[in-house]
From Swiss-Prot:
Disordered: annotated span: 1-77, 91-119
Similarity comment: Belongs to the WD repeat Groucho/TLE family.
PROSITE patterns found in the cross-reference section: WD_REPEATS_2, WD_REPEATS_REGION
Gene3D superfamilies the record matches: YVTN repeat-like/Quinoprotein amine dehydrogenase
Name listed for the protein in its UniProt record: Transducin-like enhancer protein 7
InterPro entries in alphabetical order: Groucho_enhance, WD40/YVTN_repeat-like_dom_sf, WD40_repeat_dom_sf, WD40_rpt
S-S bonds: none
Lineage: Eukaryota, Metazoa, Chordata, Craniata, Vertebrata
Organism whose genome encodes this protein: Homo sapiens
Keywords: Repeat, WD repeat
WD repeat positions: 156-194, 204-243, 247-285, 286-325, 409-441
Positions with biased composition (Low complexity): 27-49, 108-119
One of the record's GO molecular function terms: transcription corepressor activity
Length: 441
């Protein structure tokens, strides 16, 4: 429904699992409540965590239609293993009970019969040798979340670092600011005051990069900012300019690249440029609300914009029609999404984070309760956690439980952040340098 404010049930949670008092979130009418298990389903879908409905829906009277909360225990129990359940004081099967109720799968003449330790026959060995090895890429690996971080080094950029990116394949770091971009190799991450691997000078000395995005293959970088063009860089084998995409606005505030790297969105004051990256041509200059154009993101065939007017807009990338608008009641400073493109996260001026489902009319909010000038968000490629940087503090939060995994306090304000695609390193940009942390598992 174009032009109409979306009415969705908005749930409030204190970050790090701290329960909030029950309250009405939206003052407008029509806000419906959801049973607590449905919220678990919402967050569980971030990682594909299975969720079983408790039974037929319960009809509530109008007096019951209010926003509820979820306790820390209800959230945290979603991913607990056996040892964690025991530590939480929950009942678990005893070893003897497990042995009695579980069938034995040891080889023998009958199920449950003790397995003979005699050597296998040559026929069995030949059959085993004939089984092809399992390709490494099809092995299912556990999506772990880090439990801490360790500071490994500082990269001295020399000027304010407005945007930063780090690759997972080479662990190269790209620090962006006024006049130039500096490229650092992995050896510089662990060495103090090591010179950058390369310096990429911008077209004009007064140009300034304020946003950058690595392509999914990490072989290209696109940058935008106070410049007459959005710049496309080839990173391998030697970093160099591939193309200058001439812009129609003075400053690009935010960039978004589609998952297939075919489309780039560049957000300017009052409009979004939609670029075909393969052919390097401008597809469309799409007008958006002037005060709703600070940041942009893309999920599938939908792109999202937001800014000072507190409204998160969703647009159809094919018809260019406005799909929905969500009044988040506070200025939007950043937008990102989970790797599955199922949830969009909006970072607010109040430091709160709003989660919106990309296909269903569902949303909820994690409360931080602190006004901030900068709010950076980055979802890890594994999908098990994301980081949020507010002023001088960066926190790693587990998904879907929102439990705090680690916290970093910097001496100066954090302007930007990124996580390597292999989930090994975290980089933060500040006044004149970038700080590197290794994630601990």
């Amino acid at each position: 429904m174009s032009g109409e404010k979306e009415e969705a049930s908005l749930r409030m949670f204190g970050a790090y699992g701290e329960p909030e008092e029950r309250r009405d979130v939206l003052e407008s009418s029509g806000v419906s409540s959801q049973p607590e298990p449905q919220v678990q389903q919402q967050l569980g879908s971030l990682l594909g965590v299975p969720w079983q409905p408790p039974g037929p829906p319960i009809q509530h009277s109008p007096a019951d239609q209010e926003t509820s909360t979820v306790t820390q225990q209800q959230w945290h129990l979603q991913g607990l293993g056996r040892s964690e359940l025991q530590a939480a004081g929950l009942p678990d099967a005893q070893p003897g009970e497990a042995a009695e109720s579980s069938p034995s799968f040891l080889l023998g003449s009958e199920v449950g019969q003790p397995y003979s330790s005699s050597s296998p026959s040559e026929e069995v060995l030949s059959l085993l040798r004939a089984i092809p090895p399992i390709p490494d890429e099809v092995v299912v690996r556990q999506k772990r979340a880090p439990q801490g971080s360790w500071k490994v080094g500082t990269l001295f950029h020399g000027k304010r670092v407005y945007a930063v990116a780090i690759s997972g394949s080479t662990h190269h770091v790209y620090t962006c600011g006024s006049g130039y971009i500096r490229v650092w190799d992995e050896s510089a991450l662990h060495a103090g005051e090591k010179a950058p691997r390369a310096q990429l000078d911008l077209q004009h000395p007064q140009d300034r990069v304020v946003t950058c995005k690595l392509f999914p293959d990490e072989r290209s970088l696109i940058t935008g900012g106070a410049s007459q063009a959005v710049t496309l860089w080839d990173l391998a084998p030697t970093p160099q300019v591939r193309a200058q995409l001439t812009s129609t606005g003075p400053t690009c505030y935010s960039l978004a690249v589609s998952s297939d790297a075919h489309i780039c969105l560049a957000c300017f004051h009052g409009f979004v440029e939609i670029w075909d990256l393969q052919n390097q041509i401008l597809i469309r200059k799409h007008e958006v609300p002037v005060y709703g154009s600070r940041c942009v993101d893309i999920t599938g065939n939908i792109f999202w914009t937001g800014g000072e007017d507190t409204i998160l807009y969703s647009w159809d990338l094919r018809s260019y029609q406005r799909l929905h608008q969500h009044n988040l009641q506070n200025e939007i400073l950043s937008i990102t999404h989970d790797p599955g493109e199922e949830w969009v996260l909006a970072g607010l001026r109040t430091s709160d984070i709003v989660f919106l489902h990309t296909r269903r009319n569902e949303q909820f909010k994690a409360l931080m309760k602190k006004y901030t000038r900068h709010h950076s968000l980055k979802f890890a490629s594994c999908g098990s956690y994301f980081v949020t940087a507010i002023d001088t503090r960066l926190s790693g939060l587990e998904a879907p439980s929102l439990q705090k995994l680690f916290q970093i306090e910097e001496s100066s304000g954090i302007l930007c952040c990124d996580v390597s695609s292999d989930n090994q390193y975290l980089v933060m940009g500040s006044s004149s340098s970038a700080t590197i942390y290794q994630l601990l598992y």
